[in-house]
Amino acid sequence: DMFDDIFGNMFHGGSASGRSRRTSGFTGGFGGESFKSKGSDIKAGITVGFDEAAFGGDKVITLSNPENPGQPGQSLKVHIPAGIDNGKSIRLRGKGMPGTGGGEAGDLLLKVTVAPKPGYERKGMDVYTTVSVPYTTAVFGGEALVHTLYGDVMCKIKEGTQSGSKIRLRGKGIVSMKDSSVHGDQYVTIQIEVPRNLSPQARQKLKEFEEICQGSSRTA
């Protein structure tokens, strides 16, 4: 199909190839009258970074024609809405197939793929991370430095915190696409660091601690 060959384009700068969906137009009607028909939409894909999807912004992609690989491609500015997620589409109106009989052009639909970010997992508007805390901090309580999309924060670790416990950071998740005043949350899973290569003194103190705990459990 000639249109597929022309518009089966490659998008550079964070996107993949796309194919057009063509609908028939009618021209040369009765008495030579021309019937307007809107052009078909083109569907393609675009990959955006984790932070780009979270905060939004503008991204420039290049639309190239495979029949003229030596010619410079057409540059398009794409606005990434803050909060967009995997599988959502961005519509660029009038950037699809040309219409017939003077009809308007179709649209370009870019299906979004959000690239992963090490240490972060997204589920809807919520973000999930982990933080490692020393054994002593878990026992006695303290604070731990937690990375968020909005910068680092110090989180309180309660005395006697168990491995696998979760801390909820309200409003540190992804912004809602429908209401910019609404944000998801960040859930931080606690991982307790088991001490290694203990000094003889530390080992002795830990043994004493173990004996005290065992004694307490017997008398309880």
Where are the language model's segments positioned?
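Post-J-domain flank of DnaJ/Hsp40 co-chaperones
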Residues: D1-Q71, K77, T100-E104, L109, ...
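Intrinsically disordered, low-complexity linker/assembly segments
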Residues: Q74-A220
